[in-house]
């Protein structure tokens, strides 16, 4: 938990520990709340695989422990699915919703098969050399040509457990928000990179169109624009979370 201001609950991408988003959290004018899901970062793997609704309930329990009744909710990549599930499951606890580099789940405009194969295993977290070799292909944007940025990102990654990574893949299996997105009434900001091999841009347009109070911001970068366009992203999030705006 970092910062001051209204609370923002953040869900990270598959296999990614909470610490990867620390640069963003330090820039925002809100109190950021995040935690490692089972099998990721400092959390032990769950003995029983969990579905999205179970993880949303876990997040609600975290808020209960902190004494927080309502908050803004943000999800990045895989975490965007969990953010959508939380907003549907706990509409009265969700003030505003931010969906970054994400989609409606398994019913989506898919990436290329080669990208799907790269994402099917946690090898990029386990081998820095492998990550450097494939980063441009799967993340796009600056990672296609900025070797120094790729190596710096690799240095900050914490490998998930195999069980934890496979558990997150299982959580997403068969899950989609496409048919109930219209039920989410909270103001929603959809953020997307124009060169995202993992989540093609069409998915962001679908999210923004299906959400009754959704709008779309795009960034001239790839899947990790949250970090590579940090200053602009932080400004846009702060502006959106200013509850004086409509």
Which ranges hold each PLM region?
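Short beta-strand/loop motif that positions the catalytic acidic residue
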Residues: 184, 190-192, 196
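Flexible "cap/lid" loop of the alpha/beta hydrolase fold
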Residues: 84, 88, 94-124
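Active-site loop/oxyanion-hole signature of alpha/beta-hydrolase fold enzymes
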Residues: 34-74
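Conserved alpha/beta-hydrolase "acid-adjacent" motif
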Residues: 197-203
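Conserved HGGG/HGGXW glycine-rich cap/lid loop of the alpha/beta-hydrolase fold
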Residues: 1-44
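Conserved alpha/beta-hydrolase catalytic His-Asp/Glu region
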Residues: 128-180
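Catalytic histidine-centered segment of alpha/beta-hydrolase-like enzymes
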Residues: 221-234
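Gly/Ala-rich beta-loop-alpha elbow adjacent to hydrolase catalytic centers
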Residues: 75, 79, 83
